[in-house]
């Protein structure tokens, strides 16, 4: 539910209308997996959506991806978003993803109030032709374990205050 898969599929459907050779890869499983697969089928684009299940080797996929989309309804610090930025992927997060996660100039925050078509247009306008190495991204971002620790620590404090 929190990952907003229905909206993700709607975005992809609009994006696929712009770039018809695109494929959506969904990694992970959950209680709503069958419902999400059925929704993809009803949307008429299930042939262009691949459900890869749980993976322990997601880092191997980053070089094959063109973008990462997280139109989440709520989110902590998404490690997948950090990893994708290390791989120099353009990332599209909803405004519900903490802005502290962003350290790349290819990180975009889009409101969930925008339509799937608007999301798709923004994603389609991104230049995916040039990607830097992980090392140069880390140097540019000054990203290190201390930075990651501070982000996680602040999130834990925020959660603790809610209890």
Model regions and ranges:
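Nucleotide-activated donor-binding/catalytic signature segment of Leloir-type glycosyltransferases, i.e.
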Residues: 37-53
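A short hydrophobic beta-strand element within the catalytic core of glycosyltransferases
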Residues: 68-69
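A conserved mid-protein helix/loop that constitutes part of the nucleotide-sugar donor-binding site
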Residues: 1-14, 31-37
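Aromatic "clamp/platform" in nucleotide-sugar-dependent glycosyltransferases that forms part
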Residues: 54, 73
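A charged, aromatic-enriched C-terminal amphipathic alpha-helix characteristic of glycosyltransferases
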Residues: 130-163
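Short hydrophobic beta-strand element within catalytic cores of glycosyltransferases
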Residues: 90-94
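A structural motif in glycosyltransferase catalytic domains
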Residues: 8-11, 24, 119, 152
